[in-house]
Amino acid sequence: MLTLSDFDFDLPPELIAQVALPERSASRLLEVDNPAGATGPARLIDRRFAELPDCIAAGDLLVFNDTKVLKARFLGQKASGGKIEVLVERLTGERTALAQIRASKSPQPGTTIRLADAFDVTVGERVEPFYTLHFPADCLTLIEQFGRLPLPPYIEHDPDATDETRYQTVFAQNPGAVAAPTAGLHFDEALLARLDAAGVERATLTLHVGAGTFQPVRVENLAEHKMHSEWYHLPQSLADKIAATRARGNRVIAVGTTSMRALEAAARDAEAAGRPLAAASTETDIFITPGYRFRVVDRLVTNFHLPKSTLLMLVSAFAGVETIREAYRHAIEARYRFFSYGDAMLLTRRDA
C-alpha cells in the first residue's frame, strides 16, 4: 500500500518559479506519452508549450476551468488593536463569506474586525475550520476594491500589477477561487486561436479552487486524510460535448487538476446513480489516488506539483506512479520550473 512518503522528492529551491515568464505560452512542456495497453515505459518529450496544438488531434476536447481568483487576502485589526490576517475562502451570499482568520487569539462571534483599514466586518458562527464573516456591503465589490491577491505561500514576493494579470487565466469568468487553476495560465489568445484553427474543441466548467489546495497531508496512511471540499458547476453543454467526443472516437483532455476533479466527481456520481453524465452544481471532496478508475479524462495538462501533495497523488494515479517519478527526475535534471508559475506537463492516462 502506498503511503505519504512514497510521494516525497527533493526539489532544488531555485527551481520554484517566483515570477511568470514574459509570455504565457513561452513556458516549457514535458509530454509524457504512455504506451497503449500500459506496457513499457512512457516516452518523455521536451517541448515548448506553444507546440501544444501539434500534440492534440482535431476533434479532441479541451476542458478549461473558468474560475476567477478573488483578491481574497486582507490584513486587519481586532477592536482590541490586535493584528490579524484574513483569507476569504468562499462567498456564501451577497454580504457573507467563509474565511480563515489568523490571529494570536481567536475572535469571538459578534465581534468586529477592521479590514484593510477601510471597512468593518462582523464575525459570525464558526464553520470549522472557517469563520462566517458579515460584510457591510456587497462582498465581491469590497474584496476586489480592498483585498490583495492571495499568491501561494511558496511565492516570496508581494503581489504586484503583473501578478494581477498573470495569476489569472485569459478565460477567467466566474469569481470565487483563492488560487489559480494554474495549468490554464499557459494559454494566451493566440494559442487558443491556433487550437481552434486546428479543429480542437473547447469547453469550460467552473471549480472554485479553495485554500485547501495548499494544505499539506499530515497522515502517513492516505486513507486517513480528510480532503477539502470545493464547489463546481458542470454545464449540460459540456456533458453533451463529452458524449459527442466519445462517440466520434476522440479524447477528452482536462486542462488542470481542478478540471479533472470536477469531471471525475461528476462522472463518478452519475455512475453511482445509474445515469449518464449530466449537468451538476455541487460540492466535491474527491481524493484521487493510485488505484482510482478514471471515467472521463484521457489526457491532462498540468503543472509540476509539490512533494507529498494530493495533486502529486492525482497525477500519479493518472499516469502511473513510476512514470511520474521518472518524469519528475527528468524535469529536475532538465531544470524545468516548478509550481504555479512554472512549466507544464501533458500526460496520457496510463490505461488509455
UniProtKB/Swiss-Prot annotation:
Chemical reaction(s) catalysed: 7-aminomethyl-7-carbaguanosine(34) in tRNA + S-adenosyl-L-methionine = epoxyqueuosine(34) in tRNA + adenine + L-methionine + 2 H(+)
InterPro entries the UniProt entry points to: QueA (IPR003699), QueA_dom1 (IPR042118), QueA_dom2 (IPR042119), QueA_sf (IPR036100)
Domain of life: Bacteria
Keyword Metal-binding: no
Associated pathway: tRNA modification; tRNA-queuosine biosynthesis
Keyword terms, alphabetized: Cytoplasm, Queuosine biosynthesis, S-adenosyl-L-methionine, Transferase
One Pfam family here: Queuosine_synth
EC number(s) given by UniProt: 2.4.99.17
One MF term in the entry's GO annotations: S-adenosylmethionine:tRNA ribosyltransferase-isomerase activity
Biological process, per Gene Ontology: queuosine biosynthetic process; tRNA wobble guanine modification
Entry GO terms, CC: cytoplasm
Location of this chain's protein in the cell: Cytoplasm
Family of this protein: Belongs to the QueA family.
Oligomer and partners: Monomer.
Function per UniProt: Transfers and isomerizes the ribose moiety from AdoMet to the 7-aminomethyl group of 7-deazaguanine (preQ1-tRNA) to give epoxyqueuosine (oQ-tRNA).
Protein name as annotated: S-adenosylmethionine:tRNA ribosyltransferase-isomerase
Source species: Paraburkholderia xenovorans (strain LB400)
Gene (UniProt): queA
